[in-house]
């Protein structure tokens, strides 16, 4: 959706049908996670190209994600700065599942408070 909104003015319309296809879960961590930290100078220290975490295309990111998954330290996932708003994002690998507990899950639109905040924060409009 990020790239579709480039250059638009005012609220950006998103179809309700698209949102109805998305599921969401609230998850709690029940054991410490080992994350490869790609924030700040982490990518530079690990010799990972900037585009692995910041390009619009995800191809290079997928390759580096696989390389990190295969690493001997067996990280549970990665933490990186969002290219959209600079906030920290976490992507977890399958091996992290035993360290998590799903508190609730369901269609995205069932999480009304969270969806309302996202719509407001990013000037989105459901059509």
Curated annotation (Swiss-Prot):
Which portions of this protein are annotated as coiled-coil regions? none
Q: Which keywords does UniProt give here? A: NAD, Nucleotidyltransferase, Plasmid, Toxin-antitoxin system, Transferase
Q: Looking at the keywords, is Lipid biosynthesis present? A: no
Show the InterPro entries listed in the entry: RES_dom
The EC designation for this entry is 2.4.2.-
A Pfam family in this protein? RES
Q: Which top-level enzyme class is recorded in the Swiss-Prot or TrEMBL entry?
A: transferase
GO MF annotations for this entry? nucleotidyltransferase activity
Protein purpose: Probable toxic component of a type II toxin-antitoxin (TA) system. It is not known which gene encodes its antitoxin.
Question: What's this protein's family per the entry?
Answer: Belongs to the MbcT/ParT/Res family.
Its protein name is Probable toxin y4kH
Organism placement in taxonomy: Bacteria, Pseudomonadati, Pseudomonadota, Alphaproteobacteria, Hyphomicrobiales
